[in-house]
């Protein structure tokens, strides 16, 4: 693997594709806690992290499974779930006394309307001070799940079998996908009342 005497082996986490150290250094030099937003296919994780020489210290954390405990019946990896997770994190952070942070997306790119940016919008709506641009955040129709509702209505008319397969978890949990925006508002009110 080495290419001569001057070859320098990259850091292990860089080789594994886990950490962008140039970006991490810029974030750490701000001396502000980071809002770490991560999304997998089925879950959302949001954390407020402070730098420590020994290792980063997680101050507050929220997981999309926590909104399920509050009664959320939808999919935990979509934009509405990301917003609710960010809102929950923001409420927890404010209770702990953390009012400001900067967004850390890791190796994710900041694509307009992405679910990781819905986490940011949720935290900002909870009352946190996080620098951002309004135009990159997802629209209100995507945050409350109206796009899911429209697709479900279209699919129910065109192909009932595909509708039942696509939204099987919603139906199993007792939620019609057409009712997602109302259900979203109900869970949002629960989180805001915490």
UniProtKB/Swiss-Prot annotation:
Ribosomal protein is among the record's keywords: yes
GO terms under cellular component: cytosolic large ribosomal subunit
UniProt GO molecular function: 5S rRNA binding; structural constituent of ribosome
UniProt xrefs under InterPro entries: Rbsml_uL18_euk
Keyword annotations: Ribonucleoprotein, Ribosomal protein, RNA-binding, rRNA-binding
Gene Ontology biological-process annotations: ribosomal large subunit assembly; translation
Primary role: This is one of the proteins that bind and probably mediate the attachment of the 5S RNA into the large ribosomal subunit, where it forms part of the central protuberance.
Family: Belongs to the universal ribosomal protein uL18 family.
Name the UniProt record assigns to this protein: Large ribosomal subunit protein uL18
Name of the gene this protein is made from: rpl18
């Amino acid at each position: 693997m080495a290419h001569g005497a001057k070859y320098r082996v990259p850091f292990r986490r860089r080789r594994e594709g886990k950490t962008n150290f140039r970006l991490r250094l810029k974030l750490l030099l701000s001396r502000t806690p980071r809002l770490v937003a991560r999304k997998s296919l089925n879950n959302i994780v949001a954390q407020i992290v402070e730098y420590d020489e020994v290792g980063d210290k997680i101050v507050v954390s929220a997981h999309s499974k926590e909104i399920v405990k509050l009664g959320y019946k939808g999919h935990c990896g979509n934009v509405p779930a990301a917003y609710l997770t960010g809102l929950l994190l923001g409420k927890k952070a404010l209770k702990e006394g953390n009012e400001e942070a900067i967004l850390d997306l890791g190796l994710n790119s900041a694509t307009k309307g992405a679910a990781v940016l819905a986490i940011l919008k949720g935290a900002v709506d909870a009352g946190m001070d996080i620098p951002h641009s309004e135009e990159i955040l997802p629209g209100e129709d995507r945050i409350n799940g109206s796009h899911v509702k429209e697709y479900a209505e279209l699919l129910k008319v065109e192909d009932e079998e595909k509708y039942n397969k696509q939204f099987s978890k919603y139906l199993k949990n007792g939620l019609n996908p057409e009712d997602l925006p109302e259900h979203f508002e109900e869970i949002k009110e629960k989180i805001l009342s915490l």
